[in-house]
Amino acid sequence: MKFKTGLVSLLVVCGACSQATKETDVVKDSFDFAGQQLKYAFTQIDSAKASMPEEQLKRKPVSPRTIEDNGALRLVASRDWTSGFFPGELWYMYEYTQDDFWKKQAQAFTANIEDQKTNGGTHDMGFKMYCSFGNGYRLTNDANYKNILLESAATLITRYKPTIGCIRSWDHSRDKWQCPVIIDNMMNLELLYWAFKETGDSVYYNIANTHARTTMKNHFRDNYSSYHVIDYDTITGDVLHKHTHQGYNHESAWSRGQAWGL
């Protein structure tokens, strides 16, 4: 009797586990929800532009970035560091669903930021171009996407400072820093490694490696937490300041920056 009771209990538990597994598909649920959110963004673009001041419209907003506290969709211009994230999300939706609806949307929003391929005033080339054109090229093998990516990589390395061994980040706040390099910049190196694989040009590989090693040396503390901003002397390459621009204080670990480094 005890054996039968135990066996029945085991079967009930196994059945419950099996049922729970069938009812929960985290990946599908996540993509379904993401699809709903992205489609909602499409419906809000026109109204968001209609409510924008003329000055904002002159900046040519093209990519949804977030929802404001008042429920309005926030759009950003191609020059914004997040402009490549939305088209990147659309490419992931296409990859998962194989639905041409998402492919067409991804192509349209990707094309909106092509002008950034020659923007030498930003270090965010990987964020913008590799998330968008990079995923597009990976999924379609479009030769035009490849050329745009290579031009983007060539633009990015113009910001490399050999004396320092890093790609310069921001150009603003010159009264505060000479040559700021932020931990976020690690995320842009993938574009350079890709360019090396595609072209065989070791310049891309060497710059990416040197930047990573310099960052490892100067951005990280003994406990492996990281600073957000390292400011370098443009002539000597020496470290001038170790700051945390968006974290709690200069000696804190800014969580988002810590993730960028990883």
What would you call each of these model-derived segments?
Residues M1-D25:
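Bacterial Sec-dependent N-terminal signal peptides
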Residues T21-L262:
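Glycan-recognition and catalytic cores of secretory/periplasmic carbohydrate-active enzymes
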